[in-house]
């Protein structure tokens, strides 16, 4: 909402980056699933499958089931299938509960052939020094090549991959940032708070507008941007509370120059639902999920006063929640805390 990045978006971006550079190859391969039938209630057996031809492929593994505890599997050895040939063996690794993904085997990377890797391909960077192939994962990758040819690899963690953005300026770059990154008129644009740190590979030759180089982390160059701004002032007061609802008044002030793009109000609240009013107009509402409520002040032209109404959630209400809020007073119906964060670009 309001242009923020969800966890689902980050997961989809992982797949989109892979498919953009490697999807044509994967789509041409046939799928093969082991003939053993694994029932949905089986929490003990590792799920595997392959997409492959006679020369190369990808092995998929899954040890995750939502809301179920899966067994850990120490020293698992995956096998990549090939048409009419012996399977390709992977080095052993500990497959923990909750892990899932896929690994390549006999993967052609320009003139080199990557025999096996306990890491997942993300994208290709076409740089002035040649192609760099980005792989991610949290295991020791145990890279194994066929023959003497080698390709340039850039290895990152899965969390870094979730925060990865591929952009093209004078060449391709991989930018690691928790916020949005894109190219605009030949420049790198990065959203973020007053203090924003990014990691870039390879280093940007002409620098990045408003960012200063501040160090190295492996193959990546670190850049930092610091904007000084007077943060919006927020005061939240409970004006009314009864069995039906709790009514809050949120007063906002914006001292100094608004040199920021937006300001987000984050509300920790408990209840069934919450409504936000600007005067008599309802501008947003929320259903309780256990997460903070996010409200863009810039989207609503930086209002100075808002009314927030929280409706109670009672124990036993027919609403599914993975984690129930505290109902010490017989119900959950309150805003516990608020903070405001400015956003720059």
Give short role names for the model-derived ranges.
Residues 317-345:
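Exposed low-complexity, polar/acidic, P/S/T/G-rich flexible segments that act as propeptides
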Residues 256-279, 286:
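Aromatic-lined ligand-binding clefts that engage carbohydrates, nucleic acids, or primary amines
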Residues 114, 222-250:
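Edge strands and adjacent loops of beta-rich recognition modules
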Residues 1-207, 343:
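Carbohydrate-binding surfaces of carbohydrate-active enzymes
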Residues 103, 250-252, 292-300:
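Exposed aromatic-hydrophobic patches
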Residues 83, 146, 277-283:
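Short strand-turn-strand beta-turns centered on an Asx-Gly dipeptide
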Residues 284-292:
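A short acidic/small-residue loop/turn micro-motif
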């Amino acid at each position: 909402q309001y242009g923020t990045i969800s966890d689902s978006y980050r997961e989809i971006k992982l797949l989109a980056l892979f498919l953009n550079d490697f999807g044509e190859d994967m789509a041409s391969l046939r799928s093969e699933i082991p003939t053993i039938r694994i029932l949905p209630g089986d929490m003990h057996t590792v799920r595997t499958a392959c997409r492959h031809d006679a020369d190369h492929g990808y092995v998929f593994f899954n040890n995750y089931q939502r809301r179920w505890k899966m067994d850990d599997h120490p020293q698992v050895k995956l096998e990549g299938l090939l048409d009419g040939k012996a399977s390709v063996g992977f080095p052993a690794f500990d497959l923990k509960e909750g892990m899932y993904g896929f690994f390549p085997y006999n993967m052609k990377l320009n003139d080199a052939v990557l025999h096996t890797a306990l890491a997942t391909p993300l994208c290709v960077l076409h740089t002035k020094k040649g192609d760099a192939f980005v792989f991610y994962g949290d295991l020791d990758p145990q890279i194994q090549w066929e023959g003497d040819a080698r390709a340039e690899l850039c290895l990152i963690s899965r969390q870094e991959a979730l925060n990865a953005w591929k952009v093209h300026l004078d060449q391709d770059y991989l930018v690691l940032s928790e916020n949005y990154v894109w190219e605009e008129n030949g420049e790198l644009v990065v959203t973020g708070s007053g203090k924003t740190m990014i990691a870039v590979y390879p280093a940007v030759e002409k620098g990045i507008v408003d960012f200063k180089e501040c160090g190295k982390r492996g193959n990546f160059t670190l850049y930092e941007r610091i904007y000084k701004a007077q943060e919006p002032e927020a005061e939240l007061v409970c004006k009314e509370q009864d069995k039906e609802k709790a009514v809050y008044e949120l007063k906002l002030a914006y001292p100094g120059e608004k040199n920021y793009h937006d300001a987000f109000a984050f509300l920790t609240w408990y209840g069934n639902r919450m409504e936000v009013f600007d005067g008599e107009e309802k501008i947003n509402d929320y259903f309780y999920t256990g997460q903070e409520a996010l409200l863009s002040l810039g989207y609503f032209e930086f209002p100075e006063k808002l009314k927030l109404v929280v409706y109670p959630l009672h124990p036993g209400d027919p609403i599914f929640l993975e984690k129930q809020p505290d109902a010490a007073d017989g119900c959950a119906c309150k805003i516990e805390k608020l903070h405001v964060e400015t956003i720059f670009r």
